[in-house]
Amino acid sequence: MSTTFGNVFRRVNVKTLSFIVGAGALAGSATGTVMEYQDMRNYNNRNYNKQKLAALAAAHVAAKEKYDVAKYQKVYNDIALKIRDEDEYDDFIGYGPVLVRLAWHCAGTWDAKDNTGGPYGGTYRFAMETNDPSNNGLQNAAKFLEPIHEKYPWLSHGDLYSLAGVTAIQEMQGPTIPWRSGRVDQPEDTTPENGRLPDASKDAKYVRCFFHRLNFEDRQVVALLGAHALGKTHLKNSGFEGPWGAATNIFTNEFYNNLLNEKWDLITNDAGNKQYVNDKGWMMLPTDMALVQDPKYLPIVKEFANDQDTFFKEFTKAFVVLLENGIDFPQENKPIKFKTLDAQDL
């Protein structure tokens, strides 16, 4: 990875960044009962639909594709260059963080019980998912990607959203994320009901229960939450306000160090929601603080705080799983490792 972030976000103001998993903090895994499974739903989302889920379904089969690194590197480069060129977005935040949030929210609707929702079908493009209150603010990310899809109309929306997230992470000095193509756009009636994205106001029990639906274990959960090193929450989008730290446009293990080393006070924000703040103007969500309040999560937080390389390794594995949940990839669809713009001297 390049160590020169300035080439990508040349005029970023690191004090006014915004972002990623925002309203829906990532949560954790557990071997829960059916009642626990139901309780992980985001009942604070007023559009939550209590319709019953179908029986367990087989994995979606990805479209078979010839291994072609150059083909997708061109798409990666166009996304990365657009991020670089349009860096004025949101007070010079740039689009990187919100693209990661889009990839996560598209994948985060997956349900292991019946293989509905998730990263395969690109259903964010339909009104019901676009207008899910948990997706407030992601419309800007989707609009940003429209010219990319117009240039590459053969690219499915599921591939576009996931590839954009990978691109953003790598261009923000994060780890190299192996990515596979072959997701297939599905019809509107396959759009998951609102309410599948997480409620950031909850505790560790909720976190585990939520990520049980996504088949994640504790270590993967803590790794995924490390993406909160990026950007900030917005009151108008998520009901929470503030950045998680200082270096909000660089992918690091800062999130864990801030959890452990800062003094956090619980307040009620202007939206009436509880959040933690410190004297530097940073914040933590209740689901973030759950990681240091839980005796099983805490040792993992300490490990990642002390070893960024280990965090990158674990995050990479977990993020790949997130983007591939419920998908059966043919052998021909081999993982692609993209070069950053800096690595290509672009």
Swiss-Prot record:
Active site: 105, 244
One GO term describing the cellular component: mitochondrial intermembrane space
Keyword Magnesium on entry: no
Cysteine pairs bridged by disulfides in the record: none
InterPro entries (alphabetical): Ccp1-like (IPR044831), Haem_peroxidase (IPR002016), Haem_peroxidase_sf (IPR010255), Peroxidase_I (IPR002207), Peroxidases_AS (IPR019794)
Signal peptide: none
Keyword Protein transport attributed: no
Region named Disordered: 177-199
Compartments it resides in: Mitochondrion matrix; Mitochondrion intermembrane space
Site (Transition state stabilizer): 101
Protein role: Destroys radicals which are normally produced within the cells and which are toxic to biological systems.
Subunit field text: Forms a one-to-one complex with cytochrome c.
Family per record: Belongs to the peroxidase family. Cytochrome c peroxidase subfamily.
Protein name: Cytochrome c peroxidase, mitochondrial
Organism: Kluyveromyces lactis (strain ATCC 8585 / CBS 2359 / DSM 70799 / NBRC 1267 / NRRL Y-1140 / WM37)
